[in-house]
């Protein structure tokens, strides 16, 4: 699928911190119908994800595909690699100062260069959902449907605390990527999920608990496909999520929007808390914003947005009519 990767250059961009970037290169992929022949859906990937959202290696292939909930017979799907994610990037400057709002501005410039004036929907999971909020706050009429999944419009103190610990692990561990991944898996899932799956069973060959073997497996896998610089950079982007960083209010940022907003929460998520989504929905409903909070029921916590594909597909099928 890397063969389908396309490159685009943003000639001039000034970040919120005043950095002037010349010839800033990004990569992206299209899936489904040829651009200009069908409604366009932008899908923003998660922290360790990339633009391969569909197909054999796609991280959402059960949701995005021919005759799937996001039907590639009906839609053009675009996925842009978040700068710094390391996917086919050979010379990315990791010292560049960007926040998630900057990335949103850059993505909007990509859409402009591709001559996509309006999207049918923006969908994003985890940090991709935060990015979806950021794009909607910058350009209120960017899409007919705004669909953040297992995410929020800001990094709350709990998320900041976890990204702070992730950063400490990445700076100080002998196996920074592996150990940070092990820590992350404990808040991407839930106690109930792990207890039900492993039941204190042992890996007799290794002489360790199966839950430990499983965590080691995830650590090894991420080491094979993710760089330390990318992990640090994306972790920093995640903690910067905040559409009100200019000290405005949520309502002020979103109220001009005529888009439908569909927040998809996970009832057991201990990373992006469903209570925060309920509060956001309540606040924006008071302002007559067209908003609905959909809930995935799962024991699996944050990662349910990758696991509970049937529930997510059912929700998307109702939204993307």
Predicted regions located by residue number:
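Short beta-strand/loop motif that positions the catalytic acidic residue
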Residues: 257, 263-265
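Catalytic-loop region of hydrolases
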Residues: 1-40
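Catalytic active-site module of serine/aspartate enzymes centered on a nucleophile-bearing elbow/loop
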Residues: 278-321
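Alpha/beta-hydrolase-fold enzymes
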Residues: 142-221
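Conserved acidic catalytic loop of the alpha/beta-hydrolase fold
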Residues: 101-120
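Conserved hydrolase catalytic core segment
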Residues: 117-157
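Conserved alpha/beta-hydrolase "acid-adjacent" motif
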Residues: 270-279
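N-terminal cap/lid subdomain of alpha/beta-hydrolase-fold enzymes
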Residues: 29-87
């Amino acid at each position: 699928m890397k063969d389908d990767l396309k490159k685009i250059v943003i000639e001039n961009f000034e970040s919120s911190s005043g950095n002037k970037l010349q010839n800033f290169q990004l990569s992206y992929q299209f899936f489904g119908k040829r651009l200009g022949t069908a409604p366009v859906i932008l899908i923003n990937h998660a922290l360790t994800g990339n633009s391969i959202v569909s197909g054999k290696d796609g991280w959402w292939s059960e949701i995005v595909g021919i005759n799937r909930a996001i039907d590639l017979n009906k839609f053009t799907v675009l996925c842009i690699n978040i700068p710094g994610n390391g996917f086919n990037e050979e010379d990315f400057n990791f010292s560049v100062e960007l926040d998630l709002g900057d990335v949103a501005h850059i993505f909007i410039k990509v859409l402009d260069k591709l001559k996509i004036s309006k999207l049918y929907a923006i969908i994003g999971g985890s940090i991709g959902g935060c990015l979806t909020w950021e794009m909607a706050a910058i350009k209120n009429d960017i899409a007919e449907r705004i669909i953040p999944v297992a995410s929020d419009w800001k990094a709350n103190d709990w998320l900041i605390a976890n990204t702070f610990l992730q950063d400490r692990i990445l700076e100080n561990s002998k196996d920074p990527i592996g150990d940070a991944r092990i820590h992350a898996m404990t808040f991407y899932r839930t106690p109930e999920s792990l207890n039900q799956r492993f039941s204190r069973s042992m890996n007799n060959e290794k002489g360790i608990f199966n839950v430990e073997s499983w965590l080691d497996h995830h650590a090894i896998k991420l080491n094979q496909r993710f760089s330390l610089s990318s992990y640090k950079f994306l972790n920093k982007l995640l903690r910067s999520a905040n559409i009100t960083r200019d000290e405005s209010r949520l309502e002020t940022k979103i109220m001009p929007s005529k888009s439908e907003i569909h927040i998809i929460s996970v009832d057991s998520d201990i990373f992006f808390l469903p209570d925060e989504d309920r509060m956001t929905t309540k606040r924006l409903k008071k302002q007559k914003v067209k908003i609905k909070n959909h809930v995935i029921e799962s024991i699996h916590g944050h990662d349910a947005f990758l696991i509970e594909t049937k529930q997510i597909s059912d929700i998307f099928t109702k939204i993307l009519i």
